[in-house]
Amino acid sequence: MGENLPLLLSAALGKKVNRPPVWMMRQAGRYMKIYRDLRERYPSFRERSENPELSYEISMQPFLAFKPDGVILFSDILTPLPGMGINFEIIESKGPIIEDPIRNIRQVEKLKELIPNESLSFVGEVLSSLKKDVKNEATVLGFVGAPWTLAAYVVEGKSSKNYSLIKSMAFKEPDLLHKLLDHFAKSIGEYLKYQIKSGAQVVQIFDSWAGQLSPQDYDIFAGPYQKKVVDIVKEEFPDTPIILYISGSAGVLERMAKTGVDIISLDWTVDIEEACKRIPTGIGIQGNVDPGILFGNKDSIKERIDNTFNKVKERKYILNLGHGILPGTPEENAKTFFEHGKKLTY
């Protein structure tokens, strides 16, 4: 690997760095005018995320504008589904719609094995272009959705407020759900390895909806499958740092730490000082800043960044938001977040 590593990768590996790296979840997207202009020309989300030229261009937009320390692939957690035989569409302002929601064993048994270099070659293309072009100026990030969250989408058929369909399956037909989760874990593990081979230097697992589970159900339906994904990746790439993000994770932080990930990405509903006490010291911490602060003034943004960093500076830390940046966020304020983040020092 050599010692001349980009900052975010160095920090994620636990090496000594002069400042915490900074990037943002959803840093490429709707808050940027350049993205909205491109979206008018290419209204289909799937085209924007599956056409390698467009995905590359969008991934680079925030890098060219703000020079964050991480450049994350522009894609979606549902992108691998068609390669398993599950079709979906993303409708602007409505979110994802699964064409044929999975509700029975026949459908699970019909799922195809994911072969990423066949069904997701466009992702490999984008990651290798990013790696080539950002050089050591930033770290290239890949990402996937975790098995529970993918299952929540494909069983519900769309975003849900109370997850009654997948919870019904969990408590009435747990064997069926475990088969589906197991299929996803193997596929997602392979997909992450493909991303790493293609150029991703750090990867993040999003289990966006695992915060909807009680801790005891997390131990049955989410944690073991997160761990399975991590184990598959670490077997071949033991040195690639893995970040785990769950929205609403305050009740399961200790459990997240047992999955084998290197870094836990916090939402903003947990005090970061308390999180530091609950997460073992060998595990890094990312995020925790409320994305809503970016609707405030510049001073409040700087103050919140300083306040968060001062509580966590004894730890391996990556500055980020506690959720994706929100549509409508002023671009000037995103710029302040990055600029001020780069002024922090250990």
From Swiss-Prot:
Catalytic activity: uroporphyrinogen III + 4 H(+) = coproporphyrinogen III + 4 CO2
Class of enzymatic activity (EC top level): lyase
Pathway named in the protein's UniProt entry: Porphyrin-containing compound metabolism; protoporphyrin-IX biosynthesis; coproporphyrinogen-III from 5-aminolevulinate: step 4/4
GO biological-process terms attached to the record: protoporphyrinogen IX biosynthetic process
Binding, substrate: 26-30, 45, 76, 153, 208, 323
SUPFAM superfamilies (alphabetical): UROD/MetE-like (SSF51726)
Gene3D superfamilies the UniProt entry points to: 3.20.20.210
Pfam families documented for this protein: URO-D
Subunit structure: Homodimer.
Protein family according to the UniProt entry: Belongs to the uroporphyrinogen decarboxylase family.
Function summary: Catalyzes the decarboxylation of four acetate groups of uroporphyrinogen-III to yield coproporphyrinogen-III.
Name of this protein: Uroporphyrinogen decarboxylase
Organism expressing this protein natively: Prochlorococcus marinus subsp. pastoris (strain CCMP1986 / NIES-2087 / MED4)
